[in-house]
Amino acid sequence: MAFSGTSRTLTQQSSAASTDELHNILFSRRAIQEMATKCDLGRHHWMRADNAVCVRPLVPETTSNLLTRWFVSGYEAGELPSKGYMSVPQVLCAVTRTVTSDAEGSLRIYLADLGDKERAPIDAQVVSLHNRDLPAIVSFHPTYDCPMEQLNGVGRCFALVIERCGYIGHNGTTASVCSNWQPKFSSKNNNYKPAAAGKTLVLPYDRLSELSGPSAVARLLKSQLNMSASRIQLPGYVFNVRYVVSLRILRNRQSQPNARVDSEPQVFSKPVVVNGI
């Protein structure tokens, strides 16, 4: 006979484990820490030459194993209709480049099921980003719920896969990927409509273009260079001198009605970074 019952919350459906036990599995200090350290949830992952392929499960193995036992216990006691499912409504990744835009390279990002030995992209949801396309935001939508089961001693789980291609001559970090998602667990599974991976290119923020005039630019320079900070000696220049010269040029331009003030003065052989990027 099929299981019949009302739709209730997870803790209401089972008495196999106490509410405190379930809460500890999901929200303990260790569980939260491992979501960051093992899964990189909400953290910036650097793509380097020595880490060309990154596979990150969306749930730490320890948490997955504890949840699997929790569901199995309730199922075997006849209190849960299944051994548990994990669902992830959406995975959102913010990708930025950390090398010059003319560097030849790309990233390939997709979701995979660790229960698949080939780790093929789920429903062909793959996003390829050339270095010149960055920054960008990409999103993925799994089209099924992942059963909470063990395969060869490893808990089955969705995983985010990031592959770095090209970037010849760039051995350091070429891109930063910050990913966010919210896994959900239930004794009942969901049905999904097919969905394609999303990709949105992001225009770099031009802070200087939003300033109203020379005085605003001067205030920005002052806040960035911070006259009260200790003097930092560079080859041939000091930050304080650069700031004063920049202000003089801005004042001169302000006195000229047809002068352009929306671009940074080019007075040094080396560029001055004023926007913090």
Swiss-Prot record:
GO terms for biological process: transport of virus in host, cell to cell. It comes from the Viruses. The keyword Amino-acid biosynthesis does not apply. Coiled coil: none annotated. Its main location: host cell. Disulfide bonds: none annotated. Keywords: Host cell junction, Transport, Viral movement protein. InterPro entries: MPV. GO terms for cellular component: host cell plasmodesma. The keyword Transport applies. Pfam families: 3A. It is found in: Host cell junction, Host plasmodesma. Transports viral genome to neighboring plant cells directly through plasmosdesmata, without any budding. The movement protein allows efficient cell to cell propagation, by bypassing the host cell wall barrier. Acts by forming a tubular structure at the host plasmodesmata, enlarging it enough to allow free passage of virion capsids. Belongs to the cucumovirus movement protein family. This is Movement protein.
